């Protein structure tokens, strides 16, 4: 029931989408509505709604869903009007509904997803990062060919403990 964003980053194949889907399944089990879409699919649906005069209705529909999972943010650079659409959606959901975002980009690179508008990038990313749970996954790709008994392993980055010897 918490509305804080969950941001999951890491290289390709480390389980970001899988983890996001697991969060979605947990929400569904608790009776919540969930929408899972790639960033490109989400923005294409908003663009299609604009073309038939239903942009505001579609935006509000996505803004109200209790959990929105946006997969592969930053995979492609956002150009107008997609950059504005994503900002509008994030602004509508800000502190109102839970959003999970996955990305291959490191958190420090998220503004690069908005190459044409640094101010819009800053405003959007700032809303996403505010009170967010930030997870960084690392490891070999689960999709890579496997040799022998070794399995690809993903680790969650953590701060090393201080050893007081």
Enumerate the predicted regions with their spans.
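Short, flexible micro-motifs
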Residues: 13-18, 27, 77, 142
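Residue-level preference for the first positions of well-ordered beta-strands
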Residues: 5-7, 33, 67
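Walker A/P-loop nucleotide-binding motif
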Residues: 3-19
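Post-Walker A helix-loop "phosphate-sensing" segment adjacent to the P-loop in P-loop NTPases
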Residues: 25-37
């Amino acid at each position: 029931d918490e509305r804080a964003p969950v941001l999951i980053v890491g290289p390709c194949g480390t389980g970001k989408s899988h983890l996001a889907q697991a969060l979605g399944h947990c929400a569904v089990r608790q009776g919540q509505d969930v929408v899972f879409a790639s960033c490109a699919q989400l923005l294409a649906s908003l663009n299609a709604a604009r073309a038939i005069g239903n942009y505001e209705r579609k935006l509000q529909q996505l803004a109200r869903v209790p959990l929105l999972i946006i997969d592969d943010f930053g995979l492609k650079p956002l150009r107008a009007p997609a950059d504005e659409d994503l900002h509008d959606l994030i602004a509508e959901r800000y502190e109102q509904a839970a959003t999970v975002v996955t990305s291959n980009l490191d958190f420090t690179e998220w503004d690069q997803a908005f190459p044409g508008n640094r101010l819009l990038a800053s405003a959007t990313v700032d809303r996403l990062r505010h009170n967010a749970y930030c997870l960084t996954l690392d490891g070999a790709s689960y999709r890579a060919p496997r040799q022998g008994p070794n399995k690809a392993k993903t680790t969650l980055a953590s701060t090393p403990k201080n050893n007081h010897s």
